Amino acid sequence: MSIFDSIILGIVEGITEFLPISSTAHMIIVSTLLGLKQSVQNVAFEVIIQLGATLAIVLIYLEKINFKEINLWKKVLIAFMPLAVIGFLLRHQIKALFTIQTVAWMFIIGGIVFFIVEKIYSEEKVKIRDVEKVSLREALIIGFFQVFALIPGTSRSGATIVGGMLSGLSRKTAADFSFLLAIPTMFAASGYELLKNIDSFTNQNMTVLAVGFVVSFIASYIAVKLFLKYVQKYTLNAFGVYRIIFGIILLYLINQGIITS
């Protein structure tokens, strides 16, 4: 992998990891276009750029990371538990689910879900506009919605934001809680992959890793900041359209043999 490859993949990871469009398919397509094959070394690289993207979330919400916000973090950890438990118990079955076809169809289904949720969502019925006022019940509901993200192509942020909106949170508040929930979720996932692939780091080009990490951090920071402004004014329908179109294109590429599992 070259430095150019690491820059491109860092940008793609940083932009797509926390937007409700799922980073999985984007990384697959871009890696294919760059001529990169799946390898232990490339998996290690993906872990590093995920950590870079997650660190951007930490910086954005740094003011929330203190003992004064202990009640908020209790709710975040409660929301994290369903994914942690179910993900661990069903880890082998989840791995078997991963096919490019599954990713493509989940893109389309996720896009349709966005339209349905926006159809029934009403700003007048919003009960919570401050992330600190999210209750334990609502946190747990969002946590169970996050479990859907175990299905490849679903989008963790998309699932949790939808769960928050259906629980009475404003779009912005749902996004805030989703990103706070990403901190333990992503660190746990990245930490697990890091330990599993620790031997692969010995043969890595540290410059490539460092560049990917920094680029992913910057891209993620900008993407999340812009998204938080976006959801205060607009619906998720644009992301729904994008997901459906992207899913159809992905199915076409699979059918043509351009992308394979």
Swiss-Prot record:
Main location: membrane
EC number: 3.6.1.27
Keywords linked to the UniProt accession: Antibiotic resistance, Cell inner membrane, Cell membrane, Cell shape, Cell wall biogenesis/degradation, Hydrolase, Membrane, Peptidoglycan synthesis, Transmembrane, Transmembrane helix
Catalytic activity: di-trans,octa-cis-undecaprenyl diphosphate + H2O = di-trans,octa-cis-undecaprenyl phosphate + phosphate + H(+)
GO CC annotation, single: plasma membrane
Short name of any one Pfam family annotated for the protein: BacA
Molecular function, one GO term: undecaprenyl-diphosphatase activity
GO biological process: cell wall organization; peptidoglycan biosynthetic process; regulation of cell shape; response to antibiotic
UniProt-annotated location(s): Cell inner membrane
InterPro entries: UppP
Main enzyme class: hydrolase
Membrane topology: Multi-pass membrane protein
Coiled coil (residue ranges): none
Transmembrane segments annotated in the record for this chain: 1-21, 43-63, 70-90, 97-117, 134-154, 175-195, 208-228, 239-259
Keyword Transport set for record: no
Function description: Catalyzes the dephosphorylation of undecaprenyl diphosphate (UPP). Confers resistance to bacitracin.
Family: Belongs to the UppP family.
Protein name per the record: Undecaprenyl-diphosphatase
Source organism per UniProt: Nautilia profundicola (strain ATCC BAA-1463 / DSM 18972 / AmH)
